[in-house]
Structures are given as structure tokens and as C-alpha cells.
Swiss-Prot record:
Protein name: Delta-actitoxin-Avd2b 3
InterPro entries, alphabetized: Neurotoxin_3_Anemonia (IPR012509), Neurotoxin_3_sf (IPR036247)
GO molecular function: sodium channel inhibitor activity; toxin activity
Compartments where found: Secreted; Nematocyst
Signal peptide: 1-21
Cellular component, GO, one term: extracellular region
The entry's keywords: Disulfide bond, Ion channel impairing toxin, Nematocyst, Neurotoxin, Secreted, Signal, Toxin, Voltage-gated sodium channel impairing toxin
Principal subcellular localization: secreted
Length: 72
């Protein structure tokens, strides 16, 4: 019984590591934006739609046209 619990906890920890690693990667500015000297480094992989009326979570920016549109 303890070994099953241990395996379950290890799988849960591995899943959390993968999720947090993907989340941290999504916060990085796109290499293309850095190359072009774009002053709005807010064009990121993680963005939120504007139907949330600018109420984005985790410091994301709101774009009317997906992640590449102008920031609202």
C-alpha cells in the first residue's frame, strides 16, 4: 500500500515539474521580438483574449488579434 502511495506522489511531483517548466517557458519573450528590437516585449506565448476585458491572469497582456496584435 505504501509503495502505491509513493508511486502516486512521485508521478504527481513529475507532472507539477513539467507544468511549471512549460509555464516558465511561456513567460519568455519571443526571440523574433528581441531580434527586431520590438519595444513591447509583451508578445509572448501566453496571452489572454480581450473578451476578458483586460482582466488577464499571471501578468499576461490582452491582445485583440491573438498574441501578435497590439496590446490593449
Amino acid at each position: 500500500m505504501m509503495s502505491r502511495l509513493l508511486v502516486f506522489l512521485m508521478l504527481g511531483a513529475a507532472f507539477m515539474l513539467v507544468v511549471s517548466a512549460n509555464d516558465a517557458y511561456g513567460d519568455e519573450p519571443a526571440f523574433k521580438d528581441l531580434n527586431q528590437g520590438d519595444e513591447s516585449l509583451g508578445k509572448r506565448k501566453s496571452c489572454c483574449p480581450c473578451w476578458l476585458r483586460g482582466n488577464c491572469f499571471w501578468g499576461q497582456n490582452c491582445y485583440p488579434e491573438g498574441c501578435s496584435g497590439p496590446k490593449v
